[in-house]
Amino acid sequence: MAEISVTFEDGATERFPAGTSAAEALRAHAARNGALQRALKRAIAARTDGSEPAVIDLARPLFADCRLAPVAPESPEGLSVLRHSTAHLMAQAVKRLFPQVEITIGPVIENGFYYDFRRPEGFTPEDLARIEETMRAIVREDLAVAREEVARAEAIRRFRAMGEHYKVEIIEGLPDDRVSLYQQGEFVDLCRGPHVPSTGHLAAFRLTSVAGAYWRGDARNEQLQRIYGTAWARKEDLEAYLARLEEAKQRDHRRLGQALDLFSLHPIAPGSPFFHPKGALVYNTLVQYIRSLYARYGYTEVITPLIYKTELYKQSGHYDLFREDMFLIAVEEEEYGVKPMNCPGHCYLFATRKHSYRDLPIRYADFSRLHRFEASGTLAGLVRVRSMAQDDAHIFCTPDQLDDEIERFVAMTREVYAAFGFDRIEVTLQTRPEKFLGAVERWDTAEAALRRALERTGFAVTVLAGQGAFYGPKIGFDFRDVLERSWTLATVQIDCAMPERFELGYVTPEGSTATPVMIHRAVLGSLERFIAILLEQTAGKLPLWLAPVQVRLLPISEKVADYAARAVDACRAAGLRAEADLRGEKLGYKVREAQLEKIPVIAVVGEREAAAGAVAPRREGAAEAALPLDDFIARTVAEARMPGGAS
């Protein structure tokens, strides 16, 4: 009988008959290794590092030499297996409770999983509770999970007999002659695996929500019911995650936007937020802050059209690649596109004048509104919208200026994130994808420039090979928030295609014409999305300089209302955004309401303060000593100064 060599984590190598399962090989070696025995008791899968590295079922037979290790449930690979198996567990419970339901797909996602079902009447919260109860019953049954490979035609026959038409459609689209099925008790599913050895390994899970989803993500197809869940290796991990979820609900920018009267969303304009006066003030103050940086970093602001003939996007290359995400309009037998990005218009703007190398770099900044068609099912508050503005800019420079421009952008990004206390930044370099525009040589030069700039900045960088945009490599700055979520904020990309497509040029010192380098860059990205992230990061307690109401005066009684009103006027004259609560409510009520509205500075005014021309400040719920009004205003003005000293 043929034999294979298996090397274990401790470096030892043993020989086994071909076809020995991963579990058998691990158990045999564990008999001589106490540490491996303990690891194997908790293992839910195995990791191989042979000709085809993979995480596999413990029961999977081995037919080639490999390295082999157990996979612990709390490891990243183990959590993926747990969550995938819990998705199957949920589907089995749904089929037990609702036999007429058809199953579709159930992948792993960040922190959990989902499964899509066809059930026209949908699922209620009561249904989810019953499904979860049935899942726990199946866990107690500790059903063995078995893998089987069958001919594609046989798999089609089986699923057709079960009435699982979506599975039949999936299998018919697979290129392989054989497919793998997984079975636990009466439940069978099409799956590549791997999975836990038995359902008894799945103890820490919770179903979290249900939502609509279209089959294959296409709105033209039938709507399905998507049940989301989460699964963890330990119950304490699950409880910690659920606590974070509850915290996320309290920090949800949609809830805060309504509670703080910042913005609202309405069906009349899907994906296009209404910014209320307070929200517009936050929005415009952000723009003012970025404009103050533009003045220091040498940007010139431009205003470009909102609607262009689609010839522009055909020339830029966006029409073929981005058309499905555009709002297109037919007028006077011409096709127009509502602007989804600024870069083609900035190329046209650059071409309106002849440029010398002495003119470069040229840095165009643009806060124009952009519109992109996002499917209705993907819209999410301010995070995913159809109407937005960005702190968008495009730089046209010579090749010799490229490194310096990237470093200047990184410096500006550092300054902005420091202003908001965003200190957990991870940097990625995204390189040439399979489908790209422009010459390979331009891509290589651009990627090298980005690498050099990052090396000089001192950031630790993760390279994401093949994940650049179709027109150029990209640096992304990912911010990890208080809820451990990662958000891509700043991006800088070198365009390897558009300058040539628009035949852009500048006169060199030798008098010849050369193509400029074009850089796309944004620090905040979408202003709408940045506001959402900032609200959730701060739980609505915006920095003093950005708060829509910076100071609220609270008179104790009507006797001092006139003084409170005069104090507000003095605050406003000094540039503070101040107001007074002149209602006849009790002081405690007014203080509590101001705290709920996240007012940064509260100042109480009683008869003693009015007589002395003073106020009694309160911050973070704590009372401070009374201050003369002028001193209070001076201190607050200094604290409310915009970062970087801008006014």
Regions found by a protein language model. Name each.
Residues M1-T104, E110-S647:
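NTP/phosphate- and nucleic-acid-binding module
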